[in-house]
Design a protein with these regions (language model features):
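Basic, Lys/Arg-enriched alpha-helical interface segments
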Residues: 1-53, 66-73, 82-85
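Active-site glycine-centered loops adjacent to acidic/histidine catalytic or metal-binding residues
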Residues: 79
Length: 85
């Protein structure tokens, strides 16, 4: 089982989130990453970093998998229009 850690931008997004049902869905998606870091439907993002994306409605969870440390590092969470900037 992998550990899931959140970087400060992801923590800040979750703290400011007012929609509790969305918060619950995001938390469930991140808990699932602990069991299966590359679930069906996740996409590897282009670029030099080893980043993946999982969709939760109109929101995206951007994360990095470190297999040697059994770690999933959530880099950013945001609306699909803003998360890639």
């Amino acid at each position: 089982m992998y550990r899931v850690l959140l970087r400060p931008p992801a923590q800040k997004f979750l703290r400011k989130l007012r929609d509790k049902s969305l918060l619950a869905r995001l938390m469930a998606a991140m808990r699932e990453l602990a069991h299966q870091p590359r679930p069906p439907g996740c996409d590897k993002l282009a670029g030099p970093e080893n980043l993946y994306r999982v969709r939760v409605g109109d929101y995206r969870v951007i994360y990095q998998v470190q297999d040697n440390a059994l770690l999933v590092l959530v880099v950013k969470i945001g609306h699909r229009r803003e998360v890639y900037r």
